[in-house]
Amino acid sequence: MANTTGRIPLWLIGTIAGILVIGLVGIFFYGSYSGLGSSL
């Protein structure tokens, strides 16, 4: 399984996507909990 999509490995894309999703969800819940998310 050495097939890569262009120059970026698939596992790297998955890792970055996972971090971004977790970060966005964390920011959303933190903003909602602290009251800053009411303006979004």
From Swiss-Prot:
Principal cellular location given in the protein's record: plastid
Plastid is among the record's keywords: yes
GO-annotated cellular components: chloroplast thylakoid membrane; photosystem II reaction center
Membrane found in the keyword field: yes
Pfam families membership: PsbJ (PF01788)
Gene3D superfamilies membership: 6.10.250.2070
Subcellular location, record wording: Plastid, Chloroplast thylakoid membrane
Domain of life (superkingdom): Eukaryota
GO BP annotations listed: photosynthesis
Topological type in the membrane: Single-pass membrane protein
InterPro entries attached to this UniProt entry: PSII_PsbJ (IPR002682), PSII_PsbJ_sf (IPR037267)
Keywords, sorted A to Z: Chloroplast, Membrane, Photosynthesis, Photosystem II, Plastid, Reaction center, Thylakoid, Transmembrane, Transmembrane helix
Transmembrane stretches, start-end: 8-28
Record NCBIfam families: PRK02565.1
Subunit annotation: PSII is composed of 1 copy each of membrane proteins PsbA, PsbB, PsbC, PsbD, PsbE, PsbF, PsbH, PsbI, PsbJ, PsbK, PsbL, PsbM, PsbT, PsbX, PsbY, PsbZ, Psb30/Ycf12, at least 3 peripheral proteins of the oxygen-evolving complex and a large number of cofactors. It forms dimeric complexes.
Its biological purpose: One of the components of the core complex of photosystem II (PSII). PSII is a light-driven water:plastoquinone oxidoreductase that uses light energy to abstract electrons from H(2)O, generating O(2) and a proton gradient subsequently used for ATP formation. It consists of a core antenna complex that captures photons, and an electron transfer chain that converts photonic excitation into a charge separation.
Family (UniProt): Belongs to the PsbJ family.
Name of the featured protein: Photosystem II reaction center protein J
Organism: Anthoceros angustus
